[in-house]
Amino acid sequence: MTTSSYFLLVALGLLLYVFQSSFGGEHVCWLGDPNHPQGICGPQVADIVEIRCEEKEAEQGGANNARANTGRTSSLMKRRGFLSLLKKRGKRDEGSPLQRSGRGIVCECCKHHCTKEEFTEYCH
């Protein structure tokens, strides 16, 4: 393989990598990245995920009567569980000596702007 062919192959590989990382739908964040002006952060994240998950459940056949009778208690338990999961992930990442990238909900929706579909991906 000639030098120019090798250079062209490397250049195409880099171009493909840049294209995929820019338009692939996955966000990558680094410590110290600023929040997106339209990003949703803090307790609002749990509220939006809860709403999106309830909408998704309704679209897939709706909630049963037992869940409807429990009302907000069930929603509160889901929110607490979700916030607990976020705290555990945060604590796990705090101990890392490296400033590694993140691809969680904070990266997706606070550091960047989430669509409704991206919030729905966090439903269990």
Curated annotation (Swiss-Prot):
Question: What is the species listed in this Swiss-Prot or TrEMBL entry?
Answer: Conus textile
What the entry lists under InterPro entries is as follows: Insulin-like (IPR016179), Insulin-like_sf (IPR036438), Insulin-rel_pep (IPR016724), Insulin_CS (IPR022353)
Q: What is its main location?
A: secreted
Q: What Pfam families would the database entry show?
A: Insulin
Annotated signal sequence range: 1-24
List every position bearing 4-carboxyglutamate. 118
Family membership, please give it: Belongs to the insulin family.
Q: What sections of the sequence does the record tag as coiled-coil?
A: none
Protein name (database record): Con-Ins Tx1
Where expressed (tissue)?
A: Expressed by the venom gland.
What keywords are annotated for this sequence in UniProt? Carbohydrate metabolism, Cleavage on pair of basic residues, Disulfide bond, Gamma-carboxyglutamic acid, Glucose metabolism, Hormone, Hydroxylation, Secreted, Signal, Toxin
Could you provide one GO biological process annotation from this protein's UniProt record? glucose metabolic process
> Has keyword RNA-binding?
no
User: Which Gene Ontology CC terms are recorded?
Assistant: extracellular region
Q: Which residues carry this modification: 4-hydroxyproline?
A: 34
Per the UniProt entry, the propeptide covers 59-92
